[in-house]
Regions:
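Cleavable N-terminal export/targeting peptides
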Residues: 1-33
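Transmembrane beta-strand segments that form the barrel wall of outer-membrane beta-barrel proteins
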Residues: 35-50, 66-74
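Outer-membrane beta-barrel pore domains and translocons
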Residues: 46-48, 72-74, 125-129, 165, ...
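Short sequence motifs at beta-strands and strand-loop junctions characteristic
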Residues: 35, 46-49, 95-100, 150-157, ...
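Solvent-exposed, glycine/polar-rich loop segments of beta-barrel outer-membrane systems
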Residues: 137-147, 191-209
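Transmembrane beta-barrel architecture of outer membranes
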Residues: 52-54, 102, 159, 219
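Gram-negative (and chloroplast) outer-membrane scaffold detector with strong preference
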Residues: 59-173
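Outer-membrane beta-barrel "beta-signal"
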Residues: 15-23, 214-228
Length: 228
């Protein structure tokens, strides 16, 4: 009888704590049993202007933790953004863009208890980008020759992102807005073209420089997707 009394008193002494634990237990149990969105396919159309076309897959591991991975292709970079260390690609006929694969993977933690992957979150991600192009050299009169120089930019990022993902109220379509800083390791083989006027006849000259450094980049974007 005394043991039963102690149990009853302990239950009434911590009503708030018991309620929180039971709520989290119910959410965790429902995540494993209820038919809800646990997979998401997403696109990031605005990254096209930065020379990347990726597709993302997010898989909910628990009601708060998920894994997001993406694979894509790098093409022409249209934007020169100083805060990301990018250079815009030349639109001239002598620039040949060479597509390369890009990939990223990371873990996402949602700050709220929800059966489905939505709400405010924090995410840490590793990303690899490679932009490659061949620059055709010009002859004495400015005509393009068959000789080329390879321009190559390789970026390895560790990104710390914060965002908000929301499923539609009447459908499984969603949006995901995010932003945050990244530590970027860069290895660049950069081709620079200029007209040399020091000789008797003007001619095109080329400098190829290799650099390896680290910088801080910043990201802000919007993904759209579908959950199932």
């Amino acid at each position: 009888a005394s043991a039963l009394s102690l149990f009853v008193l302990a239950s009434f002494a911590q009503p708030g704590k018991t309620k929180v634990v039971l709520y989290k237990d119910r959410v965790a149990a429902a995540f494993d049993t209820v038919d809800c969105v646990k997979n998401v396919i997403k696109a990031n159309p605005l990254l096209f202007f930065r020379g990347e076309i990726p597709i993302y897959y997010e898989r909910a591991i628990t009601h708060r933790l998920s894994l997001e991975a993406g694979v894509g292709v790098t093409l022409r970079n249209y934007l020169a953004l100083s805060f990301t260390g990018d250079d815009a690609d030349d639109f001239g006929a002598g620039t040949e863009i060479i597509p390369r694969l890009s990939f990223n993977a990371g873990f996402r933690y949602y700050f709220v208890d929800d059966l489905e992957p939505q709400g405010a979150y924090g995410q840490i991600t590793f990303a690899h980008l490679n932009y490659t192009k061949d620059i055709r050299m010009k002859g004495p009169t400015g005509e393009l020759t068959d000789q080329t120089l390879r321009d190559d930019r390789t970026y390895n990022d560790v990104r710390l992102l914060f965002g908000y993902q929301m499923l539609g109220s009447s459908s499984n379509w969603l949006f995901d807005v995010y932003g945050g800083p990244a530590f970027r390791d860069r290895f660049n083989v950069k081709v620079e073209e200029h007209l040399d006027l020091t000789g008797e006849r003007p001619q095109w000259a080329y400098n190829v420089t290799e650099t390896k450094d680290q910088t801080v980049a910043f990201f802000l974007g919007l993904k759209v997707g579908y959950g199932f």
